[in-house]
Amino acid sequence: SAKEMNALQPGTRSFAQFDMDSFANVTNDNDNPYLADMTKKAIELLNSNENGFFLMVEAAHIDKFSHKNILEGSTAQVIEFNKAIQVAYDFASRDGDTLVLVTADHETGGITYNEETGEYYYTTKSHTGVNVPVYVSASDAGFITGEAYDNYCISTQLARVMGYDKSQFPKTK
């Protein structure tokens, strides 16, 4: 619950499970926290680590609504995700040593705009091959504006920024 989450103290280990279907309801008429609330609390808890931290925040309901072609739902979830991004960005701006990276693993639904009717519509209920953007809050993170990246390169670049050498990565086939 939001109450239990807010009671957590830095240094406390926590594994949280929330009623995931309730995240689809952005009016939040239950006791689950919003994604932005969870992001803020996670940063608060993780920031006490003197070695820094890595936090991944996912907004899975954007994809779930897009698979069902529910524009209002996916749009509402993008707005909620944007609030969580703003929490992270505000922290990074104050901290001065934090990078915020926002991306997606794929696009779903093929949302398209019809100029004649002024309406948006979906072209599929599946994932598309459309490139997804990568937004980075720091210019020295090694990403080049306008450049396309294979998604596996993002983790390599992030690891480099965090001080890890590629030779430390496990070998894959």
Regions found by a protein language model. Name each.
Residues 1-173:
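A post-motif C-terminal structural segment
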